[in-house]
């Protein structure tokens, strides 16, 4: 198996080095054919590597960067002022061919803007999108756009559908993914004109297994492998899912603590509860792809744990090995990036 190299923004996110370095250590122990370039401010980064006992790891390279994009930095600051940020340097490495993918837990808007500026979009892509896996009753689906584009034209939704199909084929091995449009109803008469026009485009697209509209509750029942929506709807949906999952976990804990009998029942049900938590845990599905770019870029949730960041690294290495940008180019009928 060939070695895949990931460029990691070690400083990004709410927790920075305390999450990224342990996650990298875990990934290197799982994957023999992986090299990590850790990008960040030299002194704190080398200190974190020493604390994790991986300072001399043969498959880790340290790339200095003098600046960090803060979670509340405006996009313009990240793009025009912080040109030596750990985020920017990591993405530059993909452009230069020194890495096959970049991973960051930093500011989403900044990451999309910098990635688009440095890597550019693939031929035929008007707007990149954010795509991630969502848990369902029988596995998971992929949903896009999750916030890159607040407003999207019908033609953009068609591009999202084609890109999502390419991602699912690559990472899940589903040859003919079921593609659906997220709508307020399943009937053809439901929805605004934008959605209705997009439905017509998806229905006529050759090679696209379009199965119609899906409602919000249909996302989780496994009715589709790819769920397409604009970034406003997608981001609200994603945050709602995360909030509901967190609420259910908190409610279960509160109910179990009500009495000793409930605590005893909770103890017997522990294996079931652990399995349920794993299936619903946002960290387990951490790692959103910025699709439509001339390179693989994966966004980790800013507040994720080391386990969650490791999941984002898994997504990046898989998409890099499958050369997802090239597959997206093929899906759009454009020359690929090989």
UniProtKB/Swiss-Prot annotation:
Molecular function (Gene Ontology), one example: phosphate:acyl-[acyl carrier protein] acyltransferase activity
Top EC category: transferase
Cellular localisation: Cytoplasm
Biological processes per GO annotation: fatty acid biosynthetic process; phospholipid biosynthetic process
Catalytic activities: a fatty acyl-[ACP] + phosphate = an acyl phosphate + holo-[ACP]
Pathway participation: Lipid metabolism; phospholipid metabolism
Pfam families xref list: FA_synthesis
GO cellular component: cytoplasm
Keyword Repeat listed: no
InterPro entries in UniProt: FA_synthesis (IPR003664), Phospholipid_synth_PlsX-like (IPR012281)
UniProt keyword annotations, A-Z: Cytoplasm, Lipid biosynthesis, Lipid metabolism, Phospholipid biosynthesis, Phospholipid metabolism, Transferase
Principal location class: cytoplasm
NCBIfam families to which the protein is assigned, alphabetical: plsX
Assembly notes: Homodimer. Probably interacts with PlsY.
Function summary: Catalyzes the reversible formation of acyl-phosphate (acyl-PO(4)) from acyl-[acyl-carrier-protein] (acyl-ACP). This enzyme utilizes acyl-ACP as fatty acyl donor, but not acyl-CoA.
Family listed: Belongs to the PlsX family.
Protein's UniProt name: Phosphate acyltransferase
Gene that encodes it: plsX
């Amino acid at each position: 198996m060939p070695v895949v190299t990931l460029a990691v923004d070690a400083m990004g996110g709410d927790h920075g080095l305390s999450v990224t370095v342990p996650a990298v250590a875990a990934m290197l122990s799982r994957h023999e054919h992986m090299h990590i370039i850790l990008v960040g401010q030299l002194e704190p980064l080398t200190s974190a590597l020493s604390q994790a006992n991986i300072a001399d790891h043969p498959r880790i390279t340290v790339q200095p960067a003098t600046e960090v994009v803060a979670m509340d930095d405006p996009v313009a600051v990240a793009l025009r002022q912080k040109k030596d940020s750990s985020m920017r340097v990591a993405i530059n490495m993909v452009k230069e061919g020194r890495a096959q993918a970049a991973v960051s837990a930093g500011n989403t808007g900044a990451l999309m803007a910098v990635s688009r500026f440095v890597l550019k979009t693939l031929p035929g892509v008007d707007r990149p999108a954010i795509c991630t896996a969502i848990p369902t009753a029988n596995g998971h689906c992929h949903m896009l756009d999750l916030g890159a584009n607040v407003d999207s034209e019908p033609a953009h939704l068609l591009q999202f559908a084609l890109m999502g199909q390419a991602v699912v084929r690559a990472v899940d091995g589903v040859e003919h993914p079921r593609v659906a449009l997220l709508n307020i109803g399943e009937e053809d008469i439901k929805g605004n004109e934008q959605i209705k026009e997009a439905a017509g485009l998806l229905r006529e697209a050759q090679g696209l297994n379009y199965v119609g509209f899906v409602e919000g509750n249909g996302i989780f029942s496994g009715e589709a492998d790819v769920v397409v929506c604009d970034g406003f709807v997608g981001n609200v949906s994603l945050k709602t899912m995360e909030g509901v999952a967190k609420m259910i976990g908190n409610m279960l804990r509160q109910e179990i603590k009500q009495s000793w009998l409930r605590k005893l029942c909770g103890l017997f049900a522990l294996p079931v509860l652990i399995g349920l938590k794993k299936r619903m845990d946002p960290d387990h599905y951490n790692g959103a792809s910025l699709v439509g770019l001339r390179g693989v870029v994966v966004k980790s949730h800013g507040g994720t744990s080391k386990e969650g960041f490791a999941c984002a690294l898994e997504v990046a290495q898989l998409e890099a090995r499958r050369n997802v940008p090239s597959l997206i180019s093929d899906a759009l009928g454009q020359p690929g990036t090989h």
